[in-house]
């Protein structure tokens, strides 16, 4: 089995994804943490069970990518176009998906605690079995899928989070 550097793997992913997928099948504990994939077009790549912790996919176009069981802790997906990708059983804690289009994706058993979904388009994505979605950060501009693709009793209404807390002296009290 060949050993590749992160830079060589990045080139494989970008230029010959099928060779990366073949190599990955014979590899254990693939570490692509802190890799900058920004602005890449990534299609049909198998990142299942890969450590992608703190990597950046900002401004990427990702289609049919398999993130099953991947460690996506603190990954940057800002402004990415993510279509038909599988995030099942992955860890998205602390990931920033602001301004991303994440459509037709599967988030079954995906841990979304602390995931930033500000102005994220999640149209037609399946969040019905996502874990800790109520601990994600989102705003009134987040576009959610239909109710049947959401967890039962999840409130999509924008709510204040810790970043919007105000000190008591900041609150104006009217005089009587």
Locate each region found by the language model.
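Tandem repeat scaffolds
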Residues: 4-176
């Amino acid at each position: 089995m060949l050993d590749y550097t992160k830079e060589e793997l990045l080139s494989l992913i970008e230029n010959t994804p099928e060779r990366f997928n073949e190599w990955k099948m014979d590899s254990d504990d693939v570490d692509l943490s802190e890799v900058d994939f920004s602005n890449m077009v990534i299609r049909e790549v198998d990142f299942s069970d890969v450590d992608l912790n703190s990597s950046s996919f900002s401004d990427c176009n990702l289609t049919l990518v398999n993130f099953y069981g991947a460690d996506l802790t603190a990954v940057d997906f800002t402004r990415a176009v993510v279509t038909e990708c599988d995030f099942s059983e992955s860890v998205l804690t602390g990931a920033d998906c602001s301004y991303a289009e994440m459509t037709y994706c599967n988030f079954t058993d995906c841990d979304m605690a602390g995931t930033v979904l500000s102005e994220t388009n999640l149209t037609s994505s399946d969040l019905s079995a996502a874990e800790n979605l109520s601990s994600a950060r989102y705003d009134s501009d987040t576009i959610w899928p239909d109710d049947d693709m959401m967890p039962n009793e999840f409130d999509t209404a924008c709510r204040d989070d810790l970043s919007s807390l105000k000190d008591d002296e900041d609150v104006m009290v009217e005089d009587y």
